[in-house]
């Protein structure tokens, strides 16, 4: 019985990890940070995001990334 439970648990973990590996589905919005560590200029941020990802760029503060403001890009996955 213990072997059977362990096998089911292992299969369940494989299925769960496969679902986690899928980053984005169609129609979902993804976010990436552009030019980490550089001060965000809104015009350059929006231009970089639109040309690179066909998305919308905005400046934001991120405590994990040094600097006053960073460029974030929202785009369709």
From Swiss-Prot:
GO cellular component: extracellular region
Span of the signal peptide: 1-24
An individual GO BP term: defense response to fungus
Transmembrane intervals: none
Top-level taxonomic group: Eukaryota
Record carries keyword Signal: yes
Record keywords, A-Z: Antimicrobial, Disulfide bond, Fungicide, Plant defense, Secreted, Signal
Protein location: Secreted
One Pfam family in the UniProt entry: SLR1-BP
Disulfide bond sites: 30-77, 40-59, 45-71, 49-73
Keyword Kinase: no
InterPro entries per the UniProt record, alphabetical: DEFL (IPR010851)
Family label: Belongs to the DEFL family.
Name of this protein: Putative defensin-like protein 160
Source organism (scientific name): Arabidopsis thaliana (Mouse-ear cress)
């Amino acid at each position: 019985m213990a072997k059977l439970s362990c096998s089911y648990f292992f299969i369940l973990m494989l299925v769960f990890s496969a679902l986690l590996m899928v980053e984005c589905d169609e129609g979902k919005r993804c976010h990436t940070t552009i030019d980490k560590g550089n001060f965000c200029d809104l015009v350059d941020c929006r231009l970089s995001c639109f040309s690179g990802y066909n998305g919308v760029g905005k400046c934001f503060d991120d405590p994990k990334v040094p600097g006053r403001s960073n460029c974030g890009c929202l785009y369709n996955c």
